Amino acid sequence: MPMIDIDWLKDHVEVPEGLTYEQLAKDLVKVGLEEEEIHSSQVTGPIVVGYVVDATPEPQKNGKTINWCHVDCGDEWNETDEDGNKVPRGIICGAPNMKAGEKVVVTLPGAVLPGDFKIEPRKTYGHISNGMCASERELGLGDNHNGIILLRQYGFSEAEYEALKPGQDAMHLPHLDQPLLEINITPDRGYTLSYRGVAREYHHSTGAAYTDPAVALNEKAPEPADYQPGTPVDIDVEIDDNNPIHGVPGCDRYYARIVKDFNPNAHTPNWMRRRLIRAGMRSISLAVDVTNYVMLDLGQPMHAYDLDKLEGPIVVRRANEGEKLTTLDGKEHDLSVEDLLITDSPNGERGSRILGLAGVMGGLYGEVTADTKNILLEAAHFDQVTIARSARRHKIPSEASRRFERGVDTALQPAATQMAAELMAKYGNGEPSEHPNDVNNTPRAKAIHFKASEVARVAGLDVDINRISDILTDIGCTVAGGGNGEFAVTAPSWRPDLNEPCDLVEEIARLVGYDQIPITVPPAPVEGLVGLTPDQQRRRRVADELAEFGMVESLSYPFVGDDDYKAFGFDPEATKKVSVEIANPLYGDRPYLRREILPTLATTVQRNIRRGIENVSLYELGHVYLWDPNAPAIPALPGGVRPTDEQLAALDAGLPEQPDHVAGILTGLAEDDGWMGGKRPVDWSDAVEAVRRIAGRIGAAIELDQPAADDVPVQWHPGRAARVMVGDVFTGWVGELHPRVNEALGFPAHSAAFELNLTALFATLTGKPVQAKPISTFPPVKQDLAFTVDETVTAGQLENVIRKAAGANLESIELFDVFTGEQVGEGKKSLAYAVVFRSPSKTLSAEDSDAIRKAIVAEAAEIGAQLRA
């Protein structure tokens, strides 16, 4: 995010004396530019101005020559000799540019430099060095370590230089004592990625006088050559975009201007280098630094080419299949046909040599070097989507791409090039051409029909019509009309985000002040459906019950792919045919919407287990997507008009069914070791208990039906899974996951799970409150019943028989023993139940309980069950 320097900001807007960075942050946040951080200096003093009294070269055995210097640091900081007199400090310095008579920056013992480098007296090269003459790199001001800072070369006037006295605090000279404000820029406010834009916003916040630098620069910029009949252009430029994204040309303006006879040995002025470094950019060379400085100041990314290496025409085109580019950072990139390129035409082969990835980064060929004397300046306007995609595709988030993808001013190119040309002329003795080439195909801005009443309707603000006009004019809009409260508003060239009336309402609300929007509480409806629907209430009850059971809710992305299908034993090809495929998936390996929650929930469980958490108990509520391959195709609806009821019905008919599901997975230990007993692993009974609790909470009368092994889905254990039924309605599965699934996912053995179709389950409910069974005051009759049954008969089947036969007098039933062995015979098992009978109206006699018992035995015989003696 941009770093804001108050001294630089002063170039464009009046700033009150003594403005602090804290106050600047408060002023900018009023207009939507949030403070990210105020960065303090990494350098602490004492750091002072020193005058080099003498510098004696001393050659060393290693071939290096050091200077033994005496530096006057002022009476406060000078050393004291044996007689008590103040004398210059003795300092060792190895810099080649150290010489007597210079004023330098001296870091004294006690100072701390970047990297926690502490300055203290130390013996070196046979002397005690009592301080250090600092270079830019040592102070964190840049990469220049070829010599120490000579204040004579630091941009001071002659009078200012003479006024620098030994011992004077030097922290402020290279701005080491000044913090920086880092602000957060939203994607729609790309113009504030420049001092020009931030100064404008400071003006909006405080009313301070603001001068747009682009106005004067545009006035000074020469007319393009095509506006001057008979005048040759600097270089021919062609825009040839044969693959525009969404029909939008990748480049609609390309402005080229030449600077000749540039001095390649010219140095970047210290004031500019300081500003670039404080903005977080590296000083490279005057030509490159100028283009970066213009970008930071005005907001127009620029590129400088070595003109002598180029052959016209310059062609802006899309990449061809198989083309490659080596960028300035030395990395080779395989280009996409969506990438926009800057190319030239060697040997008359039009657009055959790639110079750079437009709006992102230049290539190695054509870059400015230490021998460059003639420069081609490029300032263009590129499509936001094109640049954003290229930057992300090649992982090059450059400063230029950050600005282009947020939108750059379409009218700024001449001004930016003029500013760069002036700086190159002033500091590099270059000669700017007066015949730039401007290929300008930018569309004419459309007027927005805006009603003043929209401000009150949308934002609730009562703003006078004249103030509305003033605000829109102040942000740069051209405003016409207004007599009847309606305006024709044309957005300024630097605001591509202003396209609709609601955008203008947002701007007015922003500048009036969000704190001025009245607080109104929307009235609650007093008729019709109020509050949560019955199904919403039931969903909450399900979530509450599972949480009370000790499970933790999880939310996962509803995307699945081949790996998920295979882990659960599904046939990927068959499953894809009935799955909804996403046109632009978030993850390339998960392009389908889930048909069940378990595969996506399993990913979360798997992630926990991989991090060493084996005892996992998670559940998730959400949609699944059941696509019918025979469903009608979803129609393409026309834009700009409201669809008809028939069109909406056709759209709805083509959508997949999206029922609500709840799923849970339990792994590891259900009960850990403790003083009350040993550990117990999770098994199918824990999942069954979770399902029973859900049913009990919402009042559903579920039954568990264990099918034949061949009828169990592949993800479930064939002998330890059951259907969850409500009468004849299938609502889900519960049991243990198949051992193959546990192995594929890395789950512990016997991991259990459940998945219920809540939409189907809720549909079985009457909507009437669950009635609590009346409490009987009569005594209970307790009996234990043990039956011998075939191994194929489930405990649930026998329990249902007992419930049916006992009728209303059955209070409770619990399976307490399952036994197999020689005593019951081969292919048989014994199921023992503890049952309690109690009448709501009388005390059950021995005859009553005996009659109930006989009824149970008779009913059980229908499924082959025999009462054991």
Model-derived regions: residue spans:
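Mobile "lid/hinge" segments at catalytic clefts and subdomain interfaces of large enzymes
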Residues: 128-150, 157-160, 174-175, 179, ...
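A carboxyl-terminal module marker
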Residues: 3, 23, 473-480, 619, ...
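Beta-rich nucleic-acid/ligand-interaction surfaces
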Residues: 43-46, 219-221, 294-296, 490, ...
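Extended, well-folded interaction surfaces typified by the phenylalanyl-tRNA synthetase beta subunit core
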Residues: 197, 448-616, 836-838, 843-844, ...
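Class II aminoacyl-tRNA synthetase-like tRNA-binding/catalytic domains
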Residues: 122, 315-368, 524-658, 720, ...
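Glycine/proline-enriched, intrinsically flexible loops and inter-domain linkers
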Residues: 3-6, 12, 24-26, 41, ...
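Phosphate-backbone binding interfaces of nucleic-acid-interacting proteins
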Residues: 1-229, 351, 376, 393-395, ...
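Conserved mixed alpha/beta core segments that line enzyme active sites in large multi-domain catalysts
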Residues: 49-91, 273-274, 278, 291-368
